[in-house]
């Protein structure tokens, strides 16, 4: 590309967490390349910065092996169309943000056509399906990892990798203000609150809304004065959750909030949530938590056979220890969830808080700027 033309960066972000990372990277790249253009698949945060989406990022918001298979024809069509469009555009660099099952194949196709490729957010190759490292090596010029222990795995396999830290750790203050969050959300200043986060995908709510609301009913019996608050990413997810409430806990009162999941977590005394990036946010706002998750039985059996780790949540993976309780698959029952939440409400949080603070500091690296620096070095052939 001529030096007189603006730089063009192609990106694909698969869901909310990717949209957050993508927006941070766009801002950082714009400090170096103010006229740069950004195109691909992105979410509302990226689009607010001028990103041009060829497809809606909700196309990629699927979970589980079985669930992905049902959408496979559409996903393959989206990827094929995207490849054609990006080859025509010929960007300076393609950055696949998470969504590895979609992005790594896309990166391989683009790299074979002479486009530089970066994968932002290491797939959990150190936890399951480790042989993916060989495809990643072929598909990418650089991996940007969020977690400090990941780089050693890539170094071992001689795959270029830069640890950049996590934008959430940069964005979230070391001390979160519960009173301020409650005032913002209009919540009771004095009440004890359990935040309930059943996930952002339709498939997650399908699996988790029922056990979560049933658990909340049991918790209410033990703690009559406790209150509940749930953030939901959009109206579709709200409709799903309200349906679960009507069916399984019609007398239970839960404050429903549109978005603002971070504020909801900061406002809470304890958090019940699905495994995923939200567990990192819960750790960063430093609230006691219980992590629960389940998928279809077939998906679980297949995935379990490929797992190299017994831990699922990011706090436990970062600590390499069982810091927070995880209730996975058969353990994801209302009774076990309620018991685990009660334990958190009744016990001293100080030891867990100290671990959370230590991990927060380890991830605070000005991640977006470090990621942008790595991309710029690649684009300018300095790596």
UniProtKB/Swiss-Prot annotation:
GO biological process: lipid A biosynthetic process
Pathway of action: Bacterial outer membrane biogenesis; LPS lipid A biosynthesis
InterPro entries on file: Glyco_trans_19
Gene Ontology molecular-function annotations: lipid-A-disaccharide synthase activity; phospholipid binding
EC number(s) from the headed UniProt entry: 2.4.1.182
Top EC class for this record: transferase
Cystines in this chain: none
Any one Gene Ontology cellular component term annotated for this protein: membrane
Assigned keywords, A-Z: Glycosyltransferase, Lipid A biosynthesis, Lipid biosynthesis, Lipid metabolism, Transferase
SUPFAM superfamilies for this protein: UDP-Glycosyltransferase/glycogen phosphorylase
Reaction catalyzed: a lipid X + a UDP-2-N,3-O-bis[(3R)-3-hydroxyacyl]-alpha-D-glucosamine = a lipid A disaccharide + UDP + H(+)
Origin: domain of life: Bacteria
A Pfam family it matches: LpxB
Family membership: Belongs to the LpxB family.
PANTHER family attached to this UniProt entry: LIPID-A-DISACCHARIDE SYNTHASE, LIPID-A-DISACCHARIDE SYNTHASE, MITOCHONDRIAL-RELATED
Function: Condensation of UDP-2,3-diacylglucosamine and 2,3-diacylglucosamine-1-phosphate to form lipid A disaccharide, a precursor of lipid A, a phosphorylated glycolipid that anchors the lipopolysaccharide to the outer membrane of the cell.
Protein name in the entry: Lipid-A-disaccharide synthase
Encoding gene, per UniProt annotation: lpxB
